Amino acid sequence: MMINAKKLMKMAKKWQQRAALHRKRISFQRSNVFTSSSSTVEKGCFVVYTADKIRFAFPISYLSNSIVQELLKISEEEFGLPTEGPITLPFDSVFLEYLIKLIQRRMDGDTEKALLMSISSAKCSLQCSLLQQEQSTQQLLVL
Protein backbone atom coordinates (compact mmCIF):
# COMPACT_ATOMS: atom_id res chain seq x y z
CA MET A 1 0.00 0.00 0.00
CA MET A 2 1.48 3.33 -1.10
CA ILE A 3 0.93 6.58 0.75
CA ASN A 4 0.03 9.40 -1.61
CA ALA A 5 2.43 12.35 -1.74
CA LYS A 6 0.01 14.89 -0.23
CA LYS A 7 -0.72 12.71 2.78
CA LEU A 8 2.97 11.97 3.27
CA MET A 9 3.88 15.66 3.08
CA LYS A 10 1.14 16.44 5.60
CA MET A 11 2.38 13.70 7.96
CA ALA A 12 5.99 14.88 7.67
CA LYS A 13 5.00 18.49 8.31
CA LYS A 14 3.02 17.41 11.38
CA TRP A 15 5.98 15.38 12.68
CA GLN A 16 8.35 18.27 12.06
CA GLN A 17 6.15 20.71 13.95
CA ARG A 18 5.93 18.35 16.92
CA ALA A 19 9.69 17.83 16.93
CA ALA A 20 10.57 21.53 16.54
CA LEU A 21 11.64 21.93 20.14
CA HIS A 22 14.11 19.05 19.94
CA ARG A 23 15.85 19.91 16.70
CA LYS A 24 19.58 20.32 16.38
CA ARG A 25 21.69 22.26 13.89
CA ILE A 26 22.94 20.44 10.79
CA SER A 27 26.24 20.89 9.01
CA PHE A 28 25.46 20.42 5.34
CA GLN A 29 27.54 18.24 3.07
CA ARG A 30 27.13 17.52 -0.63
CA SER A 31 25.51 14.13 -0.04
CA ASN A 32 22.05 15.71 0.64
CA VAL A 33 21.73 13.75 3.90
CA PHE A 34 23.26 15.11 7.04
CA THR A 35 24.04 14.12 10.60
CA SER A 36 24.97 16.50 13.38
CA SER A 37 24.25 17.43 16.96
CA SER A 38 23.55 21.15 16.56
CA SER A 39 20.14 22.77 17.04
CA THR A 40 18.38 23.90 13.82
CA VAL A 41 17.42 22.48 10.46
CA GLU A 42 18.01 24.05 7.07
CA LYS A 43 14.90 25.07 5.16
CA GLY A 44 13.60 22.30 2.91
CA CYS A 45 14.73 19.42 5.14
CA PHE A 46 13.08 17.07 7.60
CA VAL A 47 14.74 15.33 10.53
CA VAL A 48 14.56 11.77 11.81
CA TYR A 49 16.42 9.96 14.56
CA THR A 50 17.55 6.35 14.54
CA ALA A 51 17.05 3.88 17.36
CA ASP A 52 20.61 4.60 18.51
CA LYS A 53 19.77 8.35 18.79
CA ILE A 54 21.69 9.54 15.70
CA ARG A 55 20.06 12.48 13.92
CA PHE A 56 19.61 12.60 10.14
CA ALA A 57 18.23 15.44 8.02
CA PHE A 58 16.84 14.66 4.59
CA PRO A 59 15.80 17.04 1.81
CA ILE A 60 12.00 17.18 1.51
CA SER A 61 12.37 15.69 -1.99
CA TYR A 62 13.22 12.36 -0.31
CA LEU A 63 9.58 12.11 0.83
CA SER A 64 8.64 11.01 -2.67
CA ASN A 65 11.03 8.04 -2.45
CA SER A 66 9.21 4.76 -1.76
CA ILE A 67 11.98 3.56 0.58
CA VAL A 68 11.74 6.68 2.75
CA GLN A 69 7.94 6.35 2.71
CA GLU A 70 8.26 2.77 3.95
CA LEU A 71 10.67 3.83 6.72
CA LEU A 72 8.20 6.48 7.91
CA LYS A 73 5.34 3.99 7.75
CA ILE A 74 7.30 1.48 9.84
CA SER A 75 8.16 4.22 12.33
CA GLU A 76 4.49 5.13 12.66
CA GLU A 77 3.53 1.46 13.14
CA GLU A 78 6.19 0.90 15.79
CA PHE A 79 6.13 4.20 17.70
CA GLY A 80 2.96 5.97 16.53
CA LEU A 81 2.92 9.63 15.58
CA PRO A 82 5.16 11.48 18.03
CA THR A 83 3.17 13.89 20.20
CA GLU A 84 6.31 15.20 21.82
CA GLY A 85 9.73 14.68 20.38
CA PRO A 86 11.19 13.71 17.04
CA ILE A 87 10.41 11.05 14.47
CA THR A 88 12.35 7.92 15.41
CA LEU A 89 13.07 5.13 12.96
CA PRO A 90 13.32 1.60 14.41
CA PHE A 91 16.70 1.02 12.76
CA ASP A 92 20.24 1.87 13.78
CA SER A 93 22.34 4.56 12.08
CA VAL A 94 24.56 2.07 10.22
CA PHE A 95 21.53 0.55 8.51
CA LEU A 96 20.09 3.98 7.68
CA GLU A 97 23.42 5.14 6.21
CA TYR A 98 23.44 2.02 4.04
CA LEU A 99 19.89 2.75 2.85
CA ILE A 100 20.84 6.35 2.07
CA LYS A 101 23.71 5.18 -0.12
CA LEU A 102 21.37 2.84 -1.98
CA ILE A 103 18.82 5.63 -2.46
CA GLN A 104 21.49 7.99 -3.78
CA ARG A 105 22.59 5.40 -6.35
CA ARG A 106 19.09 5.49 -7.87
CA MET A 107 18.66 1.73 -8.00
CA ASP A 108 16.51 0.00 -10.60
CA GLY A 109 12.92 -1.07 -9.91
CA ASP A 110 13.70 -4.71 -9.09
CA THR A 111 16.42 -3.79 -6.61
CA GLU A 112 14.12 -1.24 -4.98
CA LYS A 113 11.30 -3.80 -4.67
CA ALA A 114 13.69 -6.33 -3.10
CA LEU A 115 14.95 -3.69 -0.67
CA LEU A 116 11.39 -2.69 0.26
CA MET A 117 10.54 -6.33 0.93
CA SER A 118 13.63 -6.78 3.12
CA ILE A 119 12.87 -3.58 5.05
CA SER A 120 9.29 -4.68 5.62
CA SER A 121 10.38 -8.08 6.85
CA ALA A 122 13.07 -6.58 9.10
CA LYS A 123 10.71 -4.54 11.28
CA CYS A 124 12.47 -5.71 14.41
CA SER A 125 13.80 -2.69 16.26
CA LEU A 126 17.27 -2.21 17.66
CA GLN A 127 15.85 -3.13 21.06
CA CYS A 128 14.58 -6.42 19.67
CA SER A 129 17.97 -7.27 18.17
CA LEU A 130 19.69 -6.34 21.44
CA LEU A 131 17.31 -8.65 23.28
CA GLN A 132 18.19 -11.46 20.86
CA GLN A 133 21.91 -10.79 21.39
CA GLU A 134 21.39 -10.89 25.16
CA GLN A 135 19.53 -14.20 24.90
CA SER A 136 22.33 -15.63 22.72
CA THR A 137 24.90 -14.56 25.28
CA GLN A 138 22.88 -16.19 28.07
CA GLN A 139 22.60 -19.41 26.05
CA LEU A 140 26.37 -19.44 25.51
CA LEU A 141 26.93 -18.95 29.23
CA VAL A 142 24.63 -21.89 29.99
CA LEU A 143 26.50 -24.16 27.58
From Swiss-Prot:
Membrane topology of this protein: Peripheral membrane protein
The protein depicted here goes by the name Auxin-responsive protein SAUR67
Principal subcellular localization? membrane
Its source organism is Arabidopsis thaliana
Question: What job does this protein perform?
Answer: May promote auxin-stimulated organ elongation, such as hypocotyls, stamen filaments and petals.
Family, similarity comment: Belongs to the ARG7 family.
The gene name on file is SAUR67
From what superkingdom does this record's organism come?
A: Eukaryota
Localisation: Cell membrane
- Known InterPro entries for this protein? SAUR_fam (IPR003676)
